[in-house]
Amino acid sequence: MCHPQGACGYRITCGGAVFVHATDNESGDPRPDAVLREFAQDADVLIYDAQYTPEEAPRMKGWGHGNWADAVRLAEECRVGRLILFHHDPDRDDAAVSHIATAAQQHFPRTECAREGTIITL
C-alpha cells in the first residue's frame, strides 16, 4: 500500500474464495502498484480505497488515498469478480457516494460502494 504513514492490505483465501481489502492506497508509484496488482489478481471481492474522484485526485497527490477510476482499472486488470469502493470522503453525503457508484459502474458494472451495515458473503 502506498500511504505516507504506511498501510497494509489483506488477502484472505477461504474455501477457494479470495477477498482482498486494500486500505489507504494512492496509485501512481510503479512498485507498489505492481505488488498490489499481484495481490488483487483474480480476487472474488476487492475492497479498495476510493476517497477521491478522478478530478480531485491530482490536487490530493501525496495524501495516500485512491479514486474510483484507479479502482476500476485495477479491478479490470486483475479480473476481480466484485469491486467495493470504500474510505469515502467524510464530507460526502449518501447522494454523492451513490453518484460515484453510478460513475464507476459505467466502466465496471460489478461495482458498489460500501455503506454502514454492508455484509459480504463469499
Question: Where do the protein language model's features map onto the residues?
Answer:
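Metallo-beta-lactamase
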Residues: 13-21
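Short beta-strand scaffold segments in enzyme catalytic cores
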Residues: 8-12
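Extended recognition/assembly regions associated with phosphoester-bond processing machinery
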Residues: 20, 120-122
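Cap/insert and terminal regions of metallo-dependent hydrolase folds
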Residues: 18, 26-116
